[in-house]
Each structure stands twice: as structure tokens, then as C-alpha cells.
């Protein structure tokens, strides 16, 4: 008998709760009438990947793409004469299954982090053996080496930083880093 009384009390409580929420549920209507969930905002510096095939092997660079957004970049956000992570967020990563020559630098097959040393003229590309970095601070003493880059001025400001491979040949290419009005580049070739 006690069990029947408890069940009756629970059923009455459930019915009361349901009747109290019925008007609210009725106002909600169909799920299709409900507003859409907010969409995620795009990342301010989204990730990017660029690849090139040299001698039948794929060289890959992973980086993040910061934007100018009205800021002075070279000599401002990216100060001269200080090592820069060359992108945003995680460090820029080079993956090569073959030995390369980047500028004057011999780079064995492997995974590396790319940094740059910007100046008002000739930059240096830094290939670091330390990987898995966020991008800053720069890991002093982990350089595989540094090589000079060449400089071209872009005819118009480029809003979003990019890394690209240009002038692609079967066994060589140029690595270009472009942002604002700066185009820094270096030749990359499959090592012989």
C-alpha cells in the first residue's frame, strides 16, 4: 500500500511539473522556428599549408596567417633586428623527406621550425632543429643554420601574410614570404 501511495504522489508531482512547463514548451514551437546557434568566428590568424614536389617528394610548410588589420607591420608589429616566428600562433614548420639546399644552407631530411630575422633590407631565414614550439620564445642555440634571403617590394600592400612556393622546377623552387609590401624569398633545391 505504501508503494502505491508513493507512486501516486510521484505521478501527481510529475503531472504538476509537466503542466507548469507546458505553456513554455508551447511557446517554443518547432525546432525550425528557433534561432540558429551562433557560428564560430573565424580565427584571426587561420592555419595554412603549402606544399611543393621536388624530385617526386613533397615538401610541406605549416604556418598561421596573420593579417594587417590597419597595423604597421614591418618595423612595427614585426620589429626589425629581432627574430620573428614568421607567422602567428604555433611556430612555422618545414617537413622535408629529402635533403635540401635552402640558400647556402644544407638541410637534411626531417622536420624543422622556420624563423626569420627581419631587417629594413636583407632578411635571414633561420632553420631551427627545435620543433613543436608555440612560436615564441625563440629557442636560442637550436639553429641548424641561417641563410640570406632576397628582397622584392610588392606593388601593393598584401593584407594577409602568405608563404608560397614560386618558380617551381622539377628539382628546385623559391620560398616566398609576403606581407604588407615585403616579399622576402630564398631558393630551395633538392640536394645532390
How does the language model describe each region?
Residues 1-11:
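Bacterial N-terminal signal peptides that target proteins for export
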Residues 9-20:
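Bacterial N-terminal signal peptides
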Residues 17-19, 105, 168:
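Generic structural signal for beta-strand residues in well-ordered domains
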Residues 21-26:
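Sec/Tat signal peptide C-region and signal peptidase I cleavage site
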Residues 27-77, 82, 131-192:
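Primarily secretory-pathway and cell-envelope proteins
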Residues 83-137:
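Mid-length scaffold segments of soluble, non-membrane domains
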Amino acid at each position: 500500500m505504501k508503494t502505491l501511495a508513493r507512486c501516486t504522489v510521484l505521478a501527481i508531482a510529475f503531472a504538476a511539473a509537466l503542466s507548469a512547463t507546458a505553456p513554455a514548451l508551447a511557446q517554443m514551437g518547432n525546432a525550425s522556428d528557433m534561432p540558429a546557434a551562433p557560428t564560430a568566428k573565424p580565427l584571426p590568424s587561420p592555419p595554412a599549408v603549402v606544399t611543393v614536389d621536388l624530385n617526386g617528394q613533397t615538401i610541406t610548410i605549416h604556418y598561421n596567417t596573420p593579417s594587417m588589420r590597419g597595423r604597421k607591420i614591418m618595423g612595427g608589429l614585426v620589429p626589425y633586428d629581432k627574430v620573428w616566428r614568421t607567422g602567428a600562433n604555433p611556430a612555422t614548420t618545414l617537413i622535408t623527406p629529402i635533403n635540401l639546399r635552402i640558400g647556402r644552407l644544407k638541410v637534411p631530411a626531417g622536420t624543422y621550425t622556420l624563423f626569420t630575422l627581419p631587417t629594413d633590407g636583407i632578411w635571414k631565414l633561420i632553420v631551427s632543429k627545435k620543433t613543436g614550439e608555440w612560436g615564441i620564445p625563440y629557442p636560442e642555440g637550436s639553429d641548424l643554420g641561417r641563410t640570406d634571403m632576397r628582397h622584392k617590394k610588392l606593388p601593393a600592400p598584401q593584407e594577409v601574410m602568405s608563404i608560397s612556393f614560386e618558380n617551381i622546377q622539377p628539382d628546385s623552387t623559391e620560398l616566398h614570404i609576403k606581407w604588407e609590401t615585403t616579399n622576402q624569398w630564398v631558393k630551395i633545391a633538392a640536394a645532390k
